[in-house]
């Protein structure tokens, strides 16, 4: 602003509203504190004066907002209340400065407040009557209206605003539409989300993006409509030129895997290949988890090999999933083979890896091999938990390795775990038969667990 214009504006300000208020707003650093002081000339303020203040370019917009909020929060101090026109005037001012969060806060009372709210058609009429703003600011206003309605659950009003903007050629922001879809999804309004997306598509306006498509695909998948989601992805690619990305496909992959719908999964993966969308690290993890949980262990192993070929980081837990899958089928040789491959490819085994190995070997009756991995656990300084100890002691006993079972129980006790009463009683029975002194120790442990074993009466113990 030139010095001449500034002096002219200042002169006008002096003439149109009380100079004390004007000076207050120009110089004060804290509007609320100043207005609350007894010296403040609040009686000089009326609705007409307020409107001129709020539109004055010499007064910072943040000061206008503070003054406006002070009036709303302290109605008893004023003989008037800001009307719709005043709300809109300040809203358009902050929107012209791209202060969107302030604009939404200013719109809340007139859009959703139980007492102050106005119907949308009344707000539109006021905008038409009062607005002299440029087209892009008007667009910001209506997009802000959509978000205020959406954030506060007024979903039918969102459609009303959308229709108005479409019919009056007001630019609809694609981000606004996506955020509204996310709000609908968050509120579990799946049907409304589908309907709104259809409205976006049918409007003929370029507002459908990969982001809004992904939200709707996720909504459809949450409802179990995987086929519809896949068909929508194909349709949007052909009709709108909107290509799905890996995030879109991950929603469908995750849904197929959770439902063990491998027929549909195959179609989704083929569509990915057709669209030249590559699986990422997370997609591989989801697929491997799904295949192993269903029992498609070989497919899961094939995916791990693909990950290695593509130089993707393969974590030990992925090998653990596959090894555990083979273990469930009793294919302990495959478990050992995978463990060897894991080491050769530089993937460091963790505690769970050893647990899968030991558990699988025990189930196959290969207890000695399982015990060797227990020693490897100690060498690698992994913590041995109670379940590992219990399994090994029971399996050693089952195959007749009484001394080994006793050794595991003793180590278990040294590590602060209490052995199960059943294994202690079984070991005690076996040791009593050969008059081993360790039997008494085991019976004592059982009794301390609150169980009276048969061995007590059988061998004359009380």
Curated annotation (Swiss-Prot):
PPR repeats lie at residues 138-172, 173-207, 209-243, 245-279, 280-314, 315-349, 350-384, 385-419. Keywords: Repeat. The keyword Repeat applies. One of its GO terms (biological process) is mitochondrial mRNA 5'-end processing. InterPro entries: Pentatricopeptide_rpt (IPR002885), PPR-containing_protein (IPR050667), TPR-like_helical_dom_sf (IPR011990). The keyword Repeat applies. Gene3D superfamilies: Tetratricopeptide repeat domain. It comes from the Eukaryota. GO terms for cellular component: mitochondrion. Pfam families: PPR, PPR_2. PANTHER family: MEMBRANE-ASSOCIATED SALT-INDUCIBLE PROTEIN-LIKE (PTHR47939), REPEAT-CONTAINING PROTEIN, PUTATIVE-RELATED (PTHR47939:SF3). Belongs to the PPR family. P subfamily. This is Pentatricopeptide repeat-containing protein At2g28050. It comes from Arabidopsis thaliana.
């Amino acid at each position: 602003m030139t010095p001449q214009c500034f002096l002219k504006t200042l002169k006008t300000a002096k003439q149109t509203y009380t100079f004390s208020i004007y000076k207050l707003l120009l110089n004060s650093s804290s509007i609320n504190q100043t207005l609350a002081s007894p010296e403040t000339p609040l009686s000089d303020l009326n609705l007409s004066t307020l409107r001129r203040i709020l539109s004055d370019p010499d007064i910072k917009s943040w000061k206008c907002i503070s003054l406006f909020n002070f009036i709303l929060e302290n109605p008893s101090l004023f003989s008037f209340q800001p009307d719709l026109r005043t709300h809109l005037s300040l809203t358009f001012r902050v929107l012209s400065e791209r202060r969107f969060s302030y604009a939404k806060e200013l719109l809340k009372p007139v859009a959703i407040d139980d007492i102050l709210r106005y119907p949308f058609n009344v707000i539109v009429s006021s905008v038409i009557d009062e607005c002299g703003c440029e087209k892009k600011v008007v667009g910001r206003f209506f997009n802000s209206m959509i978000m205020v309605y959406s954030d506060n659950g007024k979903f039918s009003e969102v459609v009303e605003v959308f229709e108005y903007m479409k019919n009056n050629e007001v630019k609809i922001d694609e981000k606004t539409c996506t955020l509204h879809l996310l709000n609908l999804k968050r509120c579990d309004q799946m049907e409304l989300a589908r309907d709104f997306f259809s409205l976006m598509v049918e409007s003929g306006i370029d507002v459908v993006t990969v982001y809004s498509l992904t939200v709707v695909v996720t909504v459809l998948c949450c409802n179990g409509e995987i086929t519809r989601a896949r068909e929508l992805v194909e349709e949007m690619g052909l009709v709108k030129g909107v290509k799905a990305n890996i995030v879109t496909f991950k929603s469908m992959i995750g849904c197929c895997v959770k439902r063990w719908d491998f027929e549909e999964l195959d179609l989704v993966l083929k569509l990915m290949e057709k669209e030249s969308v590559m699986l990422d690290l997370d997609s591989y993890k989801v697929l491997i988890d799904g295949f192993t949980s269903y029992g498609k262990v070989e497919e899961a192993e094939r995916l791990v090999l693909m990950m290695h070929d593509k130089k993707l980081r393969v974590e030990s837990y992925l090998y653990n999933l596959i090894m555990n899958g083979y273990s469930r089928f009793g294919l302990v040789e495959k478990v050992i083979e995978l463990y060897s491959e894991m080491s050769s490819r530089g993937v460091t085994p963790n505690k769970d890896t050893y647990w899968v190995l030991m558990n699988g070997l025990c189930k196959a009756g290969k207890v000695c091999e399982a015990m060797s991995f227990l020693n490897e656990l100690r060498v690698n300084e992994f913590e041995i938990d109670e379940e590992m100890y219990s399994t090994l002691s029971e399996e050693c006993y089952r195959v007749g390795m009484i001394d080994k079972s006793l050794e595991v129980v003793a180590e278990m006790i040294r590590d602060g775990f209490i052995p199960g009463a059943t294994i202690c009683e079984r070991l005690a029975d076996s040791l009593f038969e050969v008059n081993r002194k360790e039997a008494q120790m085991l019976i004592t442990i059982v009794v301390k667990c609150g169980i009276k074993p048969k061995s007590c009466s059988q061998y004359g113990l009380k």
